[in-house]
């Protein structure tokens, strides 16, 4: 078992006594790219929020590397979740802060680092997603696609072992969406040990990097397996997700991590 496997066992999640997810049994393998698919309202984002810790299970459990997060002492569960980076669907940048200040928030809120070290850490991840030249812009000066890429940079700044992306191409035009997909592909190449989970309604542009696919329908898991297994399915509902579209290849700019930031993060992860 990989230390960063994400497993659901008879998991039901909801609000109050109303279940949105019903009896989910699946494992998203560590160090791989998993895509959670399904139509609107099927529970994809609810499942992602549950991994982050924004909801408690009605029944069943969630395990990371075999550890049931909701049975662990709070401090231990928090240490595991600190290794998660999240790209939320809305991006949620603070309008009063510049782009680099927004990206640095996961560090500046928890680590005592000199301002120049923080800024360089922010510039490093902005460089990775092609936004270094816009570091001192404010969010209202950026396009929707640029804000999404900034959200990705912010998710990467704390050197996560698990990256969770909620509809990363939602609301983007086809060209910008293809570039975001290409960035995810580039990230998988550069960080092959990172567990990446992408919530989407379309597998098309992620086929080349999807190691595992989980399909939800009306709050239930109807498929969990590899892409070849999905391709071998005769279920029309499953096969609709295999429409392929071409996309340009993207690469991440070379941006080695600052050892001062890595050392501070390592200390924080252990507290």
Where are these regions (language model features)?
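Helix N-cap at the start of a conserved alpha-helix in ABC-type nucleotide-binding domains
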Residues: 174-176
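Conserved catalytic motifs of ABC-family nucleotide-binding domains
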Residues: 159
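Catalytic Walker B motif of ABC-type/P-loop ATPase nucleotide-binding domains
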Residues: 163-166
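Conserved ABC ATPase "signature" region
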Residues: 67-68, 115-133
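Helix-to-loop junction immediately C-terminal to a conserved catalytic motif
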Residues: 52
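Helical segment within the ABC ATPase nucleotide-binding domain
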Residues: 178-192
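Conserved ABC ATPase signature
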Residues: 138-142, 146
């Amino acid at each position: 078992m990989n230390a960063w496997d994400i497993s659901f066992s008879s998991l039901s999640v909801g609000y109050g006594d109303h279940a949105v997810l019903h009896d989910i049994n699946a494992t998203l393998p560590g160090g791989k790219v998993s895509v959670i698919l399904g139509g609107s309202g099927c529970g994809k984002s609810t499942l992602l929020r549950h991994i982050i810790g924004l909801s408690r299970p009605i029944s069943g459990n969630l395990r990371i590397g075999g550890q049931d997060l909701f049975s662990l002492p709070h401090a231990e569960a928090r240490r595991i979740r600190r290794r998660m980076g999240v790209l939320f669907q809305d991006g949620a940048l603070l309008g009063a802060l510049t782009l680099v200040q927004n990206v640095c928030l996961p560090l500046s809120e928890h680590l005592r680092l000199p301002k120049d070290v923080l800024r360089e850490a922010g510039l490093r991840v902005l460089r990775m997603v092609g936004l270094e030249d816009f570091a001192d812009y404010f969010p209202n000066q950026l396009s929707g696609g640029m804000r999404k890429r900034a959200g990705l940079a912010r998710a990467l700044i704390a050197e996560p072992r698990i990256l969770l992306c909620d509809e990363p191409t939602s609301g983007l035009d086809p060209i910008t969406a293809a570039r975001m997909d290409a960035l995810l592909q580039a990230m998988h190449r550069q960080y092959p040990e990172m567990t990446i989970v992408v919530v989407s309604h379309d597998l098309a542009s992620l086929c080349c990097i999807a190691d595992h696919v989980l399909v939800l329908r009306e709050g239930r898991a109807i498929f969990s397996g590899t892409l070849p297994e999905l391709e071998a399915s005769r279920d029309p509902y499953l096969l609709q997700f295999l429409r392929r579209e071409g996309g340009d290849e993207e690469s991440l700019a070379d941006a080695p991590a600052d050892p001062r930031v890595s050392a501070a993060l390592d200390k924080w992860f252990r507290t």
